[in-house]
Amino acid sequence: EFFKTFNALIDQNKQLVISADRSPSDLDGVEERIKSRLGWGLVADINETTFELRLGILQAKVEQMNMYVPKDVLEFLARNIKSNIRELEGALNKVTHTSLIGRSMTVESASETLIDLLRSNHRSVTIEEIQKKVAEFFNIKVADMQSNRRLRSLARPRQIAMYFAKKFTQKSLPDIGRNFGGRDHT
């Protein structure tokens, strides 16, 4: 059904925007013909937003809400909430809500209000960084660790890197497995 809809829209010179956490060729459970069609278009890797963009979004949101939030509080939010825009706006809503219950809006009160969110937003390590460090330590290539080759010399480094990936990232076991030769460790 999606395939037919996709083709019908393309035939009508319509544009589609499809979002995923990986490239079309890496999508599991998607037919090859759909992967192929998705590959026709522009595939863009969207990276973390800049401080200036996050601050601009916050300022626009405050203006839209017709509220006053001190500049240092907005800068604090923009500097510390980097994960995604929904979380950034949610943090702004929490901070502005505290002012509605009579607390002053300061960096300190914002920090107290958002303590759990701020704790979870500290930079986390990526699977790629883990693979690089483990490969460097064992003097092997990252590509070998990512391959499906079952050499004894690769097994231990791969196991260690997968253990670290599970321990230090929020990735699921299937996601981790995909980064290590397509293994399914569910």
Swiss-Prot record:
One GO MF term: ATP binding
UniProt region (Domain IV, binds dsDNA), positions on chain: 100-186
Region called Domain II, residue ranges: 1
Spans annotated as Domain III, AAA+ region: 1-99
Region (Domain I, interacts with DnaA modulators): 1
Subunit record text: Oligomerizes as a right-handed, spiral filament on DNA at oriC.
Name the record gives this protein: Chromosomal replication initiator protein DnaA
